[in-house]
Amino acid sequence: MPHFCLVASTSMLSASYDVSQDLSSALYTSSSTYKYESASARIDCLSTTCTQVLKTLEIEHKLSMKVFATLFLLAASATAALAAVPAPNAGCSQPGQYCNGGTFLCCNNRQCNNNVRVPYSVPGYARNPSYAFSRHHGRNGSSQLSMSIWDALEELLVSGGDWVSYNQWAKYEAGARVVGTIHERRGMNEID
């Protein structure tokens, strides 16, 4: 996988709070601009560029089981973005299917990313594997914006289900390529 220059901070939050409340405060400022701002991170995604990379978040389970969720936002040209996507796989006949009949999700225009798994426990994903990549999740009248990486993180954290890890998670968000890595284990809903 190509290496990109990323800017990140390892600052941690000191107070516990409900992740769902924090993430739901994200603002869609217009149909072409997605803005998220909180005590943990700040991101401005314009129609062609995503600037500012997320801070590393330390997420702690109620039972003191710690996991780490690290999200990287990449602002890249179409050429660089496509270079980060795995080569097409014959096991994917169409988006939304599973690679080679397994548990890995086919995505990114019929390309097979063997590092992406679908969380079966979340309603919608089990019924429709392409749910995470195609669902529209509009707020404040911006329904034309597709589900953002923030919405995916929000659902991951508040689902309470048993998720497997996401690696090289990639999708288009507001015209820019977003590449992220999420590691989560079970039922996270608090940040320490």
From Swiss-Prot:
Q: Which UniProt keywords apply?
A: Disulfide bond
> Which cysteine pairs make disulfide bonds?
C45-C106, C50-C99, C107-C112
Induction of expression: Eexpression is low in biofilm, but high in sporulating cultures.
Note the superkingdom of the native organism: Eukaryota
Domain remark text: Does not have a secretion signal, has an extremely short C3-C4 loop and a very long C-terminal tail (132 residues) after cysteine C8, has an atypical hydrophobicity profile showing a highly hydrophilic C7-C8 region in contrast with class I and class II hydrophobins. Moreover, most importantly, it lacks one cysteine (Cys3 or Cys4, based on the position) of the first of the two CC doublets that define hydrophobins.
| Family according to the record | Belongs to the fungal hydrophobin family.
Q: What does this protein do?
A: Aerial growth, conidiation, and dispersal of filamentous fungi in the environment rely upon a capability of their secreting small amphipathic proteins called hydrophobins (HPBs) with low sequence identity. Class I can self-assemble into an outermost layer of rodlet bundles on aerial cell surfaces, conferring cellular hydrophobicity that supports fungal growth, development and dispersal; whereas Class II form highly ordered films at water-air interfaces through intermolecular interactions but contribute nothing to the rodlet structure.
Complex and partners:
Self-assembles to form functional amyloid fibrils called rodlets. Self-assembly into fibrillar rodlets occurs spontaneously at hydrophobic:hydrophilic interfaces and the rodlets further associate laterally to form amphipathic monolayers.
Name of this protein: Hydrophobin-like protein rodD
- Say which species the protein is native to: Aspergillus fumigatus (strain ATCC MYA-4609 / CBS 101355 / FGSC A1100 / Af293) (Neosartorya fumigata)
What gene is behind this protein? rodD
